[in-house]
Amino acid sequence: LGPSGIGKTTILRTIAGLENIDNGSIELKGKILSSKKTSIEPENRNVSLAFQENSLFPHYTIKKNILLGAERNNFKKDQSINFEELIDLLNISKILSKFPHEISAGEAQRASLARSLISHPDLLLLDEPLSNVDQSFKEEIQEKLKKILKNSKITTIIVTHDSYEAFYLGSKCGIILNQELKQYDDPYNVYHLPNSVEVVNFLNRGVLIPAEVTSPKSLENKDLGTITGNFIKPFPIGSNVKLLIQPEDLHHDDTSNLKFEVIDKKFRG
């Protein structure tokens, strides 16, 4: 998870063998894929990469494109994800006989995703897999994709700048800012326990207010007054800190004069 231009796609291309590395090594299941001295060819890594821009072959039908990965690698039927189930989950049954130029960008992206999944690789790399999917359909696809990945048990790395998507799909979440991995943790901790102001500002999921530590369990803010609670870690008395307040932390007090109307509620994982 990180902003555009930070190098997320380059990381995937490097793992897939499409870019060379300068230092270190890339290992998968104890096997060195890349190092300064050696590099296994991309087609021999059993790593599947779905690009952000669809990479469908224009002279093949969508069905042929999807099955190409499995046929190319000579996978047995029982090693692959069920074709019919995958087509149904991604809602692309009506475009199987069409060619890439006859379908929408969102349909092409889903077809590319199906092709990556069908061969059941050791490692699946998804670059902004749902960026071209219509917003009204995206949540449904996210839910289905999560189910597919869970059932297939394929290790998957997903690149996205959508924090909701990252938190919903991922069992772990890495935040990359300024070419550095700023935080790597489960989604709950990344969201509720961000480790820096940089991460908070990037996620944009709350408000930071300045405060002074006045006791082991209290802060003082000039506008809010005294704030009490249990700190995650101890701070010296008199320390200047920033308190993160997120929407979920706020509760309406029935004795308050504040009046409001709930317009919409949406569950996001």
PLM feature segments, named:
Residues K37, F51-S55, Y60, L130, ...:
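ABC ATPase nucleotide-binding domain signature
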Residues N46-S48, T61-E198:
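ABC ATPase nucleotide-binding domains
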Residues S25-R45:
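ABC ATPase NBD Q-loop/coupling interface
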Residues A16:
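Helix-to-loop junction immediately C-terminal to a conserved catalytic motif
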Residues D223-K266:
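Glycine/charge-rich catalytic "coupling/switch" loops of P-loop NTPases
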Residues T9-L12, A111:
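ABC ATPase nucleotide-binding domain helices that frame the ATP-binding cleft
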Residues D22-S25, N178:
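Conserved coupling/switch loops of ABC nucleotide-binding domains, chiefly the family-specific signature
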